Amino acid sequence: MAEVSAREQIIFDLASMEWELFQLVHNTGGRASCQDDPDTFFKMRMSQWVVYSDSVLKSCMEDFQEAAAQGRNLIFEKYGRMMETTHPEEYERVRQYFPEISEQHRENVEKITAIHLEWDKKTAEAYPYLRKNGRLATTREDSADGISMESYLRGELQCFSEKTVELILKETEEAVKDGVNLQERMIENEVRFYGYESLERAEEAHRSREGEEA
């Protein structure tokens, strides 16, 4: 059996911590189906974490640990913040539990989110069938039936510390300069978890499947 590296361990530990906290989140509409699907959850979360540096991973872990020491659940806060656009009335009832964030923090979150939106457009153009199976793209598409990639990312980033968000912004902007699409990298990691050799192979499989169902 191959030895697990320190980097692989922290990625797994982050996903594990998120999963445990996710189990403590109570949805007003009842338990969500994804709360009973650890396989999909771990594949999706680890696919995201792996694109970031060790510095970001360690900073995120520190955020989770510090929040836990304060009796806070960052996953509850993440999904709670998302409700601002999907369930505004419920959001008003829970927003008091979320720490205030500075204007600079908010601006940094929006910078990262804007870049991911551009990356998402490019990914959708290159892999339309594959992208069609993901979340909605923009906040204006949010409803009680679903949350967009934009709102999900915003809600998640708002929960992390200013230090963590600054690190993520730095790496996001560096990726732009290097011509790297981190949003696409995340999806590529995910399809590999499902056995596809590449995004191209996954796209072809989804195209064929849709053709068979038509």
Q: Residues of each region from the PLM?
A:
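A cross-kingdom feature marking solvent-exposed beta-strand/loop segments within repeated
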Residues: 28-51, 58-63, 74-76, 141, ...
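Basic/polar N-terminal segments that are highly enriched at the extreme N-terminus
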Residues: 1-2, 214
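Extended intrinsically disordered, low-complexity coil regions enriched in Ser, Thr, Gly, Ala
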Residues: 56-58, 62-80, 164, 173-188
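Polar/charged low-complexity regulatory segments
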Residues: 2-36, 86-89, 96-143, 176, ...
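Alpha-helical oligomerization segments
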Residues: 163-214
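Short, structured interface segments
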Residues: 79-82, 86-87
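Short, structured motif recognition centered on aromatic/hydrophobic residues
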Residues: 49-65, 109-113, 157-160, 164-172
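Short amphipathic alpha-helical segments that mediate assembly, nucleic-acid/protein binding
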Residues: 7-8, 42, 54-57, 105-108, ...
